[in-house]
Structure formats: C-alpha cells, structure tokens
A protein has these predicted regions:
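Glycine/proline-enriched, intrinsically flexible loops and inter-domain linkers
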Residues: 1-399
Length: 399
C-alpha cells in the first residue's frame, strides 16, 4: 500500500503540475518498510538576469496560492525525527495536504508576473517550505527586517493561532516582495488565474527587526541579526569507524538472498526466475508507465528506448521549445555496493555520469544534485559516515 501511494502521488502531482517524470530508480530494503525514503530532484530553467533578487525596503509582502492550515506544522522537524510509537499523536498534523491544481495555477500566475510586459513585477520570491511564512519572510527580510500582519493570511478553517499561521508548511503558497506600485498588477494577474492572494505587510523596519502582529496585538518581535547569527555554529565530533559501520549495516543483500534461494531450486531456468523475481531486479515498468514523461512535449530521450523499449537510466529533454539544445538528466544508485559511504558515493556519481554520457551529455557541463538523509548525528560515528559521503561528492565532482 505504501509503495502504491508513493507511486500514485508522483504520478498525479507531476502530471497536474505539467512536470515530466523522465528518470528515477526504486530500491527495496526491509529497513524502510514503515518509513519509505523518497528523493525528488527537479530542474528549472529561468532567465539568467533574474536569478538573483533581494527584497527592498517598502516592498509589500505578498502571499499567493493555497490557504494556510494546520497541515504541515513541524513537517521538517518530523521528517528529521527518530520515529517512535509516541510520534503518531505528536506529529499527526505534520504531513502536508497537497493540491496540485492550486500549485499549478499559482505557478502560472508567478510566471505571468515575471514575464509582464512592463518587466518583472516582484523584487524577490521564495516558497513556504520548511517553516512556512517564518522561513520565507525571515529569509527575504534578513537584511532589512519585516512587519507582518498574520491575521490577513487566508485560512483553510477557523481556530488557528498566530504561531500556527506563522510556521505552517502547508504547500502551494509563494511569498513575493512586490514594490507598492506593482501590487495592483499582481492582483489583476491573480484574478485572471483564479489565484488567491493577500498583503501580509511590508519589508523594511527601522531597527532591522522582524515584527509580527495579530490584529492590533503585537505577538512577536526579534532582531534579524539575532535570528540569523545569534546562535553559534555547533562544533560536533565526527569519527569514521569502519568496523562499527560493517556491524551496523544490515538490510537486504540481493546476492546473498538469491544464493540462498538458488540452493533450494533445481535447474538453471528456475535459478534465473528466482533472481529475476527479486523486487530489486524485477522490471519496474509497471511503475514507470504510470508516469507522464511527455507533458510539455519536450522529452527527446525517454525512459524506454531502443527497438524493444528497454529501460534507460538517463533521459534528455528540450527545455526551451524553439531552441535545439538538450538537457540530460540521469541518476546513480549504489545501495549495497559497499559498507563505506565514501565508496558508495563515488560509485553513485560514477554511474550517474556514465549514464548521462551515454545519452550525449558533455562531462564538463554536468552538475551534481546531492542530498543526505542520515541517522542522528549526535552519534559521532553516524556523523563520521556522513562526512565520508560528503567527501565522496566533493572528490567525485572534482574528478
């Protein structure tokens, strides 16, 4: 059921957002039965002159998109927590309730504001990911401060406290810094795309503070300098212990399991069927064929290639329809290859680069998208293994 829900979520959201799902991998391991790990990498293309932008004093804090609810509160905290029986109640609201259609029309409105005939209508923009409005406004107003009216945020239902509105990670929302003279044009675009929006306040305060109001009541005030730089960077000990890592490593090993099964099966054909029946070796076509890899019409090299539609490990899209340039996307997965995360990290990068070269990518122009999901790093040995993986990414990227 968990696998089916994950596949269904990727299928439905990607299609409705208009984002082709053209590459990926699946691996099964007993250690992830109750808590699956899903990585998502997404590549965006934008005008080079709009890559950087900062909120300016006097800019309005404009939120557009979905309404705010309790879903998603402490979502980032939950995803990093050690799961126990007590977390079911504590984090019951942590999972965000997504709405792909709302996010798609919000995306369309943002693009219309960016490509407006009079020029880009906003100074800066960010999403409401981990931390919701708190991280979005806190990051954008780091250098100049911000005054926020939380009671103006559209809510999914009544009864939310100022804290809940401030930290909810409910998706489908974007925060823009908009010059006051452009707010009317932003409103017209939102009305045209049927996107809800609100004015949450203003960037820029005299003392570079973050000030929060709920109606006539001030519910928060903190200096931006303290919020961003007031907590010293912690120093942690990292130790690489290969013997401990070998003992801790468990889970499924396709080779060992298959050899055990082969001992009980007579005949090479049955042996082959046993190997191919393992979920890590069996065809994933039933998953891949559910995904929309054609949306936008820019897919050139697709998930299944060749006369017999064999599976590929890299793909090519044409991101700008009127330009004859391709963008290759590939991946590498080296689970179980070794007990050393450095070796596995290098192997994954090596596999990914080879896959991309096979579809025509220039090795000198390959960029690595890496991410880390790791056991609690309060244990120096866990942190040591994380350092090993990071070193592999560095060495592999520079090789």
């Amino acid at each position: 059921r968990i696998l089916g829900e994950v596949v269904g979520g990727v299928r439905d959201y990607g299609n409705r957002m208009g984002i082709p799902t053209i590459d990926g991998g699946v691996w099964f391991d007993d250690r992830y039965i109750g808590n699956p790990l899903v990585y998502v990498g997404c590549v965006g293309v934008m005008p080079r002159d709009l890559i950087e932008g900062d909120a300016r004093p006097g800019d309005r804090i404009i939120a557009m998109g979905g309404r705010t609810g309790r879903d998603g509160i402490h979502g980032a905290t939950f995803s990093s927590a050690e799961l126990t029986d007590t977390h079911a109640d504590e984090f019951s609201h942590a999972v965000q309730i997504g709405n792909a259609i709302t996010e798609k029309v919000t995306l369309d409105a943002v693009l219309a504001a960016r490509d407006h005939p009079d020029g880009c209508l906003f100074s800066s923009i960010t999403d409401c990911g981990a931390g919701g409005f708190s991280s979005a406004v806190g990051e954008m107003g780091e250098k100049i401060g911000a005054a926020v009216r939380l009671d103006r945020a559209p809510l999914k239902y009544e009864g939310l406290s100022p804290v809940e509105v401030w930290i909810s990670e409910a998706q489908e929302r974007m925060v823009l810094a908009v010059p006051a003279e452009n707010v009317e044009a932003i409103a017209a675009i939102c009305d045209r795309h049927d996107v809800e929006w609100c004015d949450l306040g203003e960037f820029g305060t005299p003392d570079r503070e973050l000030v929060l109001h709920w109606g006539d009541v001030e519910v928060g005030r903190i200096a931006m300098e303290f919020m961003h730089d007031g907590v010293p960077m912690p120093l942690r000990e990292a130790v690489w212990d290969p013997e401990w890592a070998a003992r801790e490593a468990g889970g499924d090993d396709v080779g060992v399991e298959s050899m055990r099964a082969i001992g009980d099966v007579a005949g090479v054909f049955d042996m082959t069927a046993t190997l191919l029946g393992h979920p890590n070796l069996a065809s994933k076509a039933w998953i891949v064929r559910q995904y929309d890899h054609e949306v936008q019409g820019g897919s050139v090299v697709k998930p299944f290639v060749g006369p017999n539609a064999g599976p590929g490990d890299a793909a090519v899209i044409r991101p700008v329809p009127d330009r004859p340039r391709g963008l290759a996307i590939g991946h590498g997965l080296a689970t179980g290859l070794a007990r050393d995360p450095y070796v596995m990290g290098l192997a994954a990068i090596d596999e990914c680069v080879r896959n991309m070269v096979c579809v025509g990518a220039d090795p000198d122009r390959i960029a690595i998208l890496d991410n880390f999901c790791w056991p609690g790093c309060d244990d120096p040995r866990n942190l040591g293994s994380l350092v090993r993986a990071a070193e592999a990414c560095l060495d592999g990227g520079l090789a």
